[in-house]
UniProtKB/Swiss-Prot annotation:
Protein's UniProt name: GATOR2 complex protein WDR24
Record: residues binding Zn(2+) 2: C972, C975, H994, H997
EC number per UniProt: 2.3.2.27
Biased composition (Low complexity): 563-578, 682-695, 760-812
Annotated pathway: Protein modification; protein ubiquitination
Gene: wdr24
GO molecular function terms noted in the UniProt entry: transferase activity; zinc ion binding
Keywords on record: Lysosome, Membrane, Metal-binding, Repeat, Transferase, Ubl conjugation pathway, WD repeat, Zinc, Zinc-finger
Catalytic activity: S-ubiquitinyl-[E2 ubiquitin-conjugating enzyme]-L-cysteine + [acceptor protein]-L-lysine = [E2 ubiquitin-conjugating enzyme]-L-cysteine + N(6)-ubiquitinyl-[acceptor protein]-L-lysine
Organism (species): Dictyostelium discoideum (Social amoeba)
Biased composition (Acidic residues): 584-593, 743-759
GO biological process terms, semicolon-separated: positive regulation of macroautophagy; positive regulation of TORC1 signaling; protein ubiquitination
Subcellular localization, as worded in the UniProt entry: Lysosome membrane
Amino acid sequence: MNQMNQPPNKCQTYLNLGSPLSAISSSPDSTKLIVAGRDIVKIVSVQNNEFKVTSNLRAGKTQSLNYTGNDCCWHPSLLENYRFLIATAATNGAVVIWNTVREGSKSVERVFTDHSRAVNKLAWHPEKLDCILTGSQDNTLRMWDIRDSANASKITFSPKSESIRDVQFNPSQANQFAAAFDNGTIQLWDIRKPTIAVEKITSHQGLVLTIDWHPEEKNIIASGGRDRAIRVWDFSNGKSLNNVSTISSVSRIKWRPGNKWHIASCSSIVDFQIHIWDVKKPYIPLFSFTDHRDVPTGLIWKSPSSLISCSKDSHLLLNEFQDSYKPYQHIRTTGITWNVNNELASINDKINRTQSNESLPSLSTQFPSFFASFNVPTPPPLPPLVKVEQGIMNIYTPKYQNSEIVYDEKYLFEHFAKNYRFRGESFNQLCDHNQFVSQSVNQHHISTMWSLLKLHYSNLDEIQQHKELIEQQQKEELEKLNNKKIEKQQPQKLKKQQQQQQQQQQQQQQQSQQQLQQPQLQQPQQQQQLQQPQQQLRQQNDKNIKEQQIQYIENLENKQLDSKNIIDNSNDSNQEININKEDKEDEEEDDDNTSNNLDDNQMGDIFDPSNDMMTAKEPPSSSLMEFNANDTGNDQFCNILSAEAVTPLVSLPTSISLERQKSTDNISDNNSNVHVNIKRQNQPTNNNNNNSNIDNLEKKSNKSKSTKENKESSLTDQNKQKRNDNKEKIDNNEIDNDNKDNNDDDDNDVDNIGEDNDEINNNNDNNNNNNNNNNNNNNNNNNNNNNNNNNNNNNNNKNNNNDNNNNNNINNKKNKIKNKSIENKKDILDKKEINDEDNKSNDENDSLKILIPCFEFEEFNFQPIITDMLEACIEKGDVQTCVFIVLILGRYMDLNIEKHRLTTWFGSYIELLQRYKMWSLALEVMKYCDDQIINQASKRHTTLISACSSCGKSIPQNSIICEKCNKASSKCSICRLPVKGMWVWCQGCGHGGHLEHMKSWFIDKNQKSCPTGCTHICTPFKK
């Protein structure tokens, strides 16, 4: 049903006293009021909700400051001698006791003037009826006895603080009172201990202007201060129970009777309204009285539904709740909440905000005399009445067909902490599992991180296994070495034992020989007979060794004839020898260049312009390679190839060509360091090098003599003849040996053939060089020299023909051996090529072209991206993902992250786990962290705080008895005796006892509940 807020009826009671009011107090029977101000002290009767002034206590008195009313208080007793007593406090520090029965000047009974400054508050003792308590600006509290006029101040309290703003006796304990101070503290005093305060609470930031004890709850007091707050305190523990924020400073507060947590307040400035608050709902007041035109100064509850107030606007008002402004009725009721399914429910009142046509009467028309009494603008009208309809509740869910579930941060943290893994599986499995966990809660950016880690570091497990295998092999090798050492040591011990046994046997034999009576001459004869055949064998071996040495010396003499002849003629032809040395050095350099060019051409890479790729050429086949085992390398004309026959090309080194080159090198190494010589047919000679040598000779031959040249030519002819004779002998011997051992020495035969052919070519080159040199010399020398040169030419031609004939005979004899050796060599190379290429098929027999790119990619460094990724997670506050990535990758590599940063990451994550009470997960992270600071944190900072099982207060170390309840905290719940040693307790209820007693109770007797009878189930239910 639609309901309308009705306007307030004319039910207010007010009284204009003509002067600003400062305080108000009620009689014990609530029929009269005492109102005090700067210029008035009057008694007002309250009958039928109407105010009437019955007496003026200041009538006919002089304008003395003793009679000004800064505060007033009616005696709370109903006894005849006390119910008419009234006390007032003046601004000059005087305290006046009034008797309302008397009239005129006799109404003043006592005047106390011990305070030096203004008295702010008065309070009668609830039990000692003749005593009154005062608080002053002079920083003292005084207890007065109204019966003693000479020395009335019986007790003086010196709190050593600032000015006292308010004092009140505790209704539950008459000997205690509370005082409010300007320094923001509230102190609890006992009149029996006037030297020191019992309790002190710092309640406000600034002045504490008012306090009020709760009428029902013990030790609970409310305070209001200049910091615009109302606070509720419990003096038993000094804790703040509630806090109400207002818009201005609070000058007076008063608990509402009949309503436990309702309290009224008024302000000293700005706010002229009186508010009634519910301290459990501190944001909006329940009721507000808006009739005063100036700040209220006093509050008295006449009943739970009516409030009497005075103000500096000189008015005394009786406020009824039915006339009050109710903010809750003028605001829209709204409720909002979440459920477990992430659904949002809200409820709102449907309000019709259309204005009603009826205009509301103003308060000035209702109370003309009230508003005409002072020049105050008329108050604004109340908010317009609004038609309220029935509330509407709406339920919203973020889960639609095309939307995703929204997860709370707390839920995500707990979900990841419980489901993430960092050990027990391989790297790829851990990444897959963590990716699935993050994807199940729609955290796609985190799942992408795990997938990237798996994509780049997919081979970490294989690398780790390889390292472990290497470590195992090293360990096994060390064990073998140790075992060998042990085995070597054992035979030494055995040898020592055997030697000792032999010595013992020899001693026994000597003893036995002495006992024998046979002659000793027979024994040397027998020994001589045994030694004769051994001497014959030694003599034969010595003869064979001498014959071999003689043959070896003869061969050396034949080979060193050239060098001896050259040394004999060295003193006569130093210049020519130097020329020959320079020629030899040039020729050796040419040989090196040609050999290098050949290697580059045959083993290097050739650019193929058709496909812009590099083709790696196959190593030369076995038919083009011959192994010479007898090549000594002493001849300077061996292994010379013409530079014109080779066209050097720029080669790009590739990994595949290098691997093939290594494979061919391995083949040559396996053949006992055999020199490789490459045969080439129809190669033109390099005339450039020869021409350069000829030019050098022409420059230097002018200084030489013709006789020296003739001697040199004759020496060379003799040396060549001796060389050829030696070669024929060596080759014939080799042929005979090859016929005997064809199957074992095929490789050496082929190499010998290659050597013979190379020497033929070298001899031809030497003859040509001699011819050229002789022709040049003919131009500069005499006719005698010409004849000598012609003779040399003829001799050279004859020698060449002899060499060719000898070599042809040798080649004819070795054709069969050569064919067999080549076939065997092909088989060996084919097998090794198959092993090197990992059983790959060859498309071509002569050469295999492999496509290789012209450039190589550098290895991509993924580690800086990982560090940036971790830093981005830290900036988002996701320390959890960073910790798990470090735990997983840290086992395989060094992440190059600063140690103190890792310590802060792990420390933050462990602290979060401990806040969520995930103790086991926090300890697991500590255990497997590589940082020693984190790993040993549980060992250094593990503390156990015990609490009393009866009151719950913590017990200090090395103490058994609780300080609060004075009970032994370690009593057994079954035997009720103190426990010394092992203590077992339930973490739910805190009860425990001896280990044996707990076992007998829960295991033997099969009990589930606590033995103390606290109804707690200490053991889980069994399914």
